[in-house]
Amino acid sequence: MRVLRYAALLLSVVTLAGCGNEVEVELVWGGPPQPDPGGVVSVNGFRTFQDNVDEHWEGSAAMAAAEFLRLDERTVTRTTIDGKASSEGTGPQTVTVTLDGLLDDSIRAERWTLGFEQVNETYRLTAALREQRCQPGRGHQEFSAEPCV
């Protein structure tokens, strides 16, 4: 659903740009879409967003992960960001973001595993997986894509 909202926003920006007025519109990423039952999250909307912006966060896989997840809008007790690059320091990178202490009755924590590929000076999101850990008594205590109760 967010992809459709983003497409509508992009269309209105293009429409405004074609009017000849010098109207500046700042594009804002709305956050990741809902995962499928296996925890896989589509990255297509974010890649389109990246195609239309030139921001400092694109130069770091960890900062791009923070933008994709909209960490600036999340309220948690603890956020952990762990980045791993290939042995030579170039090539694909994996960023794991753990959000612990969520203000939710069922879900205690979320873990996001994000794949990035460096293209010139930017890190492009290639894959996203969301797993969750349930509150005690509300389901599984290990990270899993399975829902909490």
Where are these predicted regions, by residue range?
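Sec-dependent bacterial lipoprotein signal peptides
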Residues: M1-A17
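Bacterial signal peptide processing site
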Residues: C19-V23
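Post-signal peptide N-terminal segment of mature Sec-exported envelope proteins
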Residues: L27-R47
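Compositionally biased, intrinsically disordered linkers/stalks adjacent to structured regions
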Residues: P37-G39, G137-G139, F143-V149
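A small/polar (G/S/T-enriched), proline-flanked helix-loop surface module common
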Residues: N44-D51, G83-K84, S144
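Mature extracytoplasmic domains of secretory-pathway proteins
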Residues: N52-E110
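Short beta-strand edge/turn micro-motifs at domain boundaries
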Residues: L114-F143
